[in-house]
């Protein structure tokens, strides 16, 4: 049948870095007033998340890191995690000339982050030789692979 999806572009949002104030450890919500509050709600409501990022200089794009750092709000004082378990997670990367030797460690990092939150790894997809926004269109087989991965998420 299908699924309802929403594209969230971190680069279009105001996501401030965590200040380490630890207010979130007192049972209160994060005190930073930015777009992350809405993303906390979206993550809690989602059945699955596809985390996509271009890979720049052997790492995720800059907008990814403040987003991930703010997951600190889910960490309880005893280092357990207060987040609904069992949601599905897929990693998707585009990159220039790098390949699995660079991308696998990034994927492992994200798998660890999202597994800590209780997500279940549901796949990993990537395509190299993508330098411009529309370069992925040159790889119809990869687009079909991504569609199949999406169909698998809703099964």
State each model region's role.
Residues 31-117:
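Helix-loop-strand module that forms the ligand-binding subsite of alpha/beta enzymes
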Residues 15, 60, 99, 131-132:
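Generic structural signal for helix capping and beta-alpha/helix-loop junctions
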Residues 7-29, 132-142:
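N-terminal beta-loop-helix "entrance" segment that forms/cooperates
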Residues 1-3:
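N-terminal beta1-alpha1 ligand-phosphate binding loop
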Residues 10, 93-96, 127:
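Cofactor-binding loop segments of dinucleotide-utilizing enzymes, especially the Rossmann-like FAD-
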Residues 104, 108-155:
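Glycine-rich phosphate/pyrophosphate-binding loop and the adjoining helix
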